[in-house]
């Protein structure tokens, strides 16, 4: 029905793997857009120290996923980073919510993946720091 209505769809074999692939982009870009002071994704890619942090977080997500049995190729990480600057001054949904004073899905996007990574024995210190920072920034 979605495709009949013109909505592109894609069937995946494993929703958990699809979620970790989505987190490759969401964890760094949604989180750092807030933590870095409310900046758009193109700036996260253009400022060298932030671009390095984005890439490092992507690798932590990839590592955590691997500990859970999901293979996310390096090529996928590069593609996720490379498609972002052409989006322009894109503000991720978490940043939009944060700036509007709405609740940010800190637990769903950062907290739960962190806990699952840790339970699988993955060391993800950058994700730990980002999660702690976002909890403080979004506390009401």
PLM regions with names:
Residues 1-28, 32-74:
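Internal alpha-helical scaffold of NAD(P)-dependent oxidoreductase catalytic cores
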Residues 3, 43, 52-140:
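NAD(P)-dependent Rossmann-like dehydrogenase/reductase catalytic/cofactor-binding core
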């Amino acid at each position: 029905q979605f495709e009949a209505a013109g909505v592109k769809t894609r069937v995946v074999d494993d929703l958990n793997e699809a979620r970790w692939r989505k987190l490759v982009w969401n964890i760094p870009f949604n989180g750092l857009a807030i933590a870095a002071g409310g900046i758009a994704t193109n700036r996260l890619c253009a400022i060298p120290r932030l671009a390095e942090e984005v890439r490092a977080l992507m690798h932590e997500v990839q590592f955590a996923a691997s500990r859970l049995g999901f293979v996310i190729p390096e090529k996928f990480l590069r593609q996720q980073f490379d498609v972002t600057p052409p989006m322009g001054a894109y503000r991720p949904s978490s940043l939009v919510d944060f700036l509007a004073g709405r609740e940010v899905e800190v637990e769903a996007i950062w907290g739960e993946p962190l806990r699952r990574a840790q339970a699988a024995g993955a060391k993800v210190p950058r994700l730990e720091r980002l999660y702690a920072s976002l909890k403080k920034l979004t506390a009401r």
